[in-house]
Each structure stands twice: as C-alpha cells, then as structure tokens.
C-alpha cells in the first residue's frame, strides 16, 4: 500500500507541475510551447520543485524512498531487476526533462541545482547507512539503489548549478557523469537483483 500512496502523491505533484506550465503557456500541453514560454522565476521554480518531488517519488529519493525497500523483497527477482534497473531511472529522466528542457527558456536557477545536490547527498549517505544495517539481500540492494540515485542526483544538481553560473564545461562534465552512472547503475543493479 505504501508504493500505491507514494506513486499517487508523485503523480499528483507531476500533474500539478504540468498543469501550472500549461496554464502559463497559453493552455497548451505541447512540450514545444513549454520550451518557448519564458516563465517568471517564481512560476518556473514552482514547476521545477513540484516536478522534482513528483519524479523524486518515482526515483526513490529520501524522504520519498519508503516504498523501495518494501517493494523489492515482495517482488520476484526479475521484477526487482526491472524496477531498479529501469523504472526508477524514469524519475531521473523526468527531473532532467523538466529542469533542463521544458523550462529552458526561463533559465536554470542556481538554487535548483543546490537543492538537487542536497537531496542527492542525503539520499546517498542515508541510503548506504541503511544498506549497511540490512541482512535481507533484496532490501540491501533497494537501499543501495537509493544511494546510487543520490549519487546520480549529485551530478545532475552540479550540472544545473554550473549551467546557471554559465560554467558550460563543468555543466557538461557533471551531466555526462550523471548520465554515465545512470546507465551503469541500470546495468549492474539489474544483474545483482537477478542473482539475489
């Protein structure tokens, strides 16, 4: 039931973000219109924060991670491999899509990147701390996924902050590192769950 609740809370936050963008983009749901609209900094920030926590619930960031260690032990290993290897990466994609693409005309703000890095750091440190206390292999791997999502978010946040400060080289390097680790985690975590 916890996954059901968190998934629906995430859905409501994502919908609120997209409905806000639609409202300020002339009533259009087209991504091209979102990209072309220069939202005010306040509206862009509201849209990003809603999307971040909505997609963060899908990705399993702390404090929205509670469903991961409960769902993985209940699911068959092949389903856990798919969930951790693929499904939670959709949350990362959503954060990147909204923050770096759909709100691009409004410009990325430094504090967005800092917020993403703070939640990434919290998720990575607490994820590994919880994993060290686990004796159930699937729960351990679930907390390990929380940690790795945190590491990925550190790169995403660093990229956003650097982009806002016009440090293009650092922004590209941080984003490449985040995307590389996203792919890396998708490959090895699926294998670990299949072996669990």
Residue ranges of predicted features:
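Hydrophobic transmembrane alpha-helices and their helix-loop junctions in integral membrane proteins
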Residues: 1-196
């Amino acid at each position: 039931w916890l996954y059901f609740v968190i998934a629906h809370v995430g859905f409501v936050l994502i919908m609120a973000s997209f409905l806000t963008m639609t409202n300020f983009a002339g009533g259009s749901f087209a991504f091209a219109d979102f990209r072309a609209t220069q939202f005010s900094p306040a509206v862009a920030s509201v849209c990003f924060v809603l999307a971040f926590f909505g997609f963060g619930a899908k990705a399993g960031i702390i404090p929205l991670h509670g469903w991961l260690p409960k769902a993985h032990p209940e699911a068959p290993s092949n389903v856990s491999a798919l969930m951790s290897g693929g499904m939670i990466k959709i949350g990362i994609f959503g954060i990147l899509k909204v923050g770096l693409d759909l709100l691009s005309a409004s410009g990325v703000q430094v504090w967005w990147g800092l917020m993403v890095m703070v939640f990434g750091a919290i998720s990575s440190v607490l994820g590994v701390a919880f994993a060290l206390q686990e004796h159930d292999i699937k729960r351990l791997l679930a907390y390990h996924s929380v940690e790795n999502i945190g590491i990925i978010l550190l790169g995403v946040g660093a990229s956003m902050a650097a982009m806002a400060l016009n440090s293009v080289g650092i922004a590209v390097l941080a984003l490449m590192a985040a995307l590389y680790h996203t792919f890396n985690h998708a490959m090895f975590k699926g294998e670990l769950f299949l072996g669990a």
